[in-house]
Structure formats: structure tokens, C-alpha cells
Amino acid sequence: MKIIIDTDPGQDDAITALLAIASPEIELLGVTTVAGNVPVSMTTRNALQMLDLAGRPDIPVYAGSNKPLLRAPITATHVHGASGFEGAVLPPPSRKENEGHAVDFIIDTLRNNEPGTITICTIGPLTNIALALNKAPEVIQRAKQIVMMAGAFSEVGNITPAAEFNIYVDPHAAQMVLSSGIPIVMMPLDITHQLHTSAKRIARMEALPNRVGPVVAAWLRMEKAYEAKKYGTDGGPLHDPNTVMWLLRPDIYSGRKVNVQIETQSELTMGMSVVDWWQVGLLPANVTFLRTVDDDEFYEVLIERLGRLP
């Protein structure tokens, strides 16, 4: 299956790309970057480094939006560190990003492939996708689906009491995408908070006989220490790799189709995912919203796939 990853790397963003590259079922056509965890100059540099780590400097990287549609930029350096890749030291990128804008790459790639053949995995704010919708709405409709790490229901928020980070950074973009009519699969905090990066699981990654395993372990030890302390768990949640894992193993997830809207008016609940799980509203379902995951099987697949890399 052909995919584009739209991302703001971030340690767990990089693990998402590594999982995709390690999986023969997936053809990663390109990586597009957006401001989120850190500014776009850093997310682009990190994307280049993660592809070098995987031994795939041939995969194109296009820099995208450096700010949300309407709001001031918000970062998560308190989680990911100043560079977004704290925890492991990687060599400088072997190349520069590709010429051109991420939005144009997304549009051109969808235009040049058969309709319904490309999945967009979004693991950062949805600014690039919203801009593509605004620029070429008829082209973006050619996407097979968008699989996004975004939102929350029972877990509510991780950046404010009401909002998940990727949505909160650019809630207006998120609402545009959710209103687009494109098939959407949402991996919310309800899923990711079941996937504890325990010391035992990290140790298994560190023991992989390649260069990727120890780097991933170092990333997770750094990034997830903050969240483990915050939530009082045996390891912080693992967020972004769920997008690619769902493509590989949808059988380990469960959920249902519901309506999801994003709050864009109230400062108190800005960016809240309003999930009609109990179908009490009148709006039609626009999202496949997932709520449970087999955490042990998730990590078995992830660790095995990471072990295939250099």
C-alpha cells in the first residue's frame, strides 16, 4: 500500500516512519513536515535524519507549513526536548530536503496516482492537509483515506484539560479536514494511553542487533520519562506508530464510526474533540474512531519489524 507520512518529528514520529520502512506491505512515497513538536526547520532536519538512520535517504522529504492556519505556533519541547530528537545523538543529515512545498508534493502525488490508492498518515498538526484541501479540494478527494493520530474521548486532553496536542496546535485545520468527506481513521489518546513504553519493552528494543534498536530505546527513555511521571504509569504512551500499525494489523484494534467535531471558538475548550460516541447528536459519522488495542501484540509486531532494519 502506498502512503505519505505528514509529520512533526518527534521521537515517536520517527518510530512511525521506521515501522513503515521496515514493512514490505507499505511503500512510503514521501515524508512531509509541519511545525508541531518543534519548529518546521527542526522537524525537517529530523525527518532527514530518521530516513538516514533507516538507510533510506532516497525517500523524498518536503518541508511544509511553519505555523498553524490562524493561531500562534505551539510546540512540545517540554516532552521531546529542544531539537525534538533528544535522547540520542545522530549524525547530521546526509542531504537537504527536496525543493518545493509539502502541500504541492501531496497534491501532485495524489494527482499522479490512481484515485483511492494513497493513504495519508498524519501524525502532527493537520495544517498541511488543510492547506492542500483549500488549494486543490478535488485532488485531495483522490486519497484513499487519512489515518491520523489525533483527538481523544475518555482521555480528554494531554496539552490542555480539553485537547490533544495535534488538534490543539491547529484546531481550525483539523475541523477542515474532518469536514472534507475523505474517509478518516482516528487514533486518539484512548488508544495510545494503553501502549505503555515499559522498561521491559524498551530493553527488548535496545537489545536488537542493529543500529536502529538502541537509538529507538534511547529516544523512548528520554521522551517517555516525562509522560510516565505525569500519568504514574510504567512507561509513557506511544502515540504516532498506531497510524502505520493499523494499516498492517487492523485486527488488533476496535472502535466504531462516529461523528467528531473540533471546538474552534472557546478558549476554555479550544481544540477539544467532540466525539459523539453514543450517537446522541444528529450529525452523520465522519470518522472511524478507535478505542481499544491489543498492547502486547502491538509491541510484538513493532519490535519484530524494527529488528529488520539496519
Swiss-Prot record:
Compartment(s) of residence: Cytoplasm; Nucleus
Superkingdom classification of source: Eukaryota
Molecular functions (GO terms): nicotinamide riboside hydrolase activity; nicotinic acid riboside hydrolase activity; purine nucleosidase activity; uridine nucleosidase activity
CDD domains documented for this protein: nuc_hydro_IU_UC_XIUA (cd02651)
GO cellular component: cytosol; nucleus
Active site residues of this protein: 239
Gene Ontology annotations of biological process type: nicotinate nucleotide salvage; purine nucleoside catabolic process; pyrimidine nucleoside catabolic process; pyrimidine-containing compound salvage
Pfam families assigned: IU_nuc_hydro
Primary site of residence: cytoplasm
Record has Repeat as a keyword: no
Keywords, ordered alphabetically: Cytoplasm, Glycosidase, Hydrolase, Nucleus
Family: Belongs to the IUNH family.
Protein name from the UniProt record: Uncharacterized protein C1683.06c
Lineage, top ranks: Eukaryota, Fungi, Dikarya, Ascomycota, Taphrinomycotina
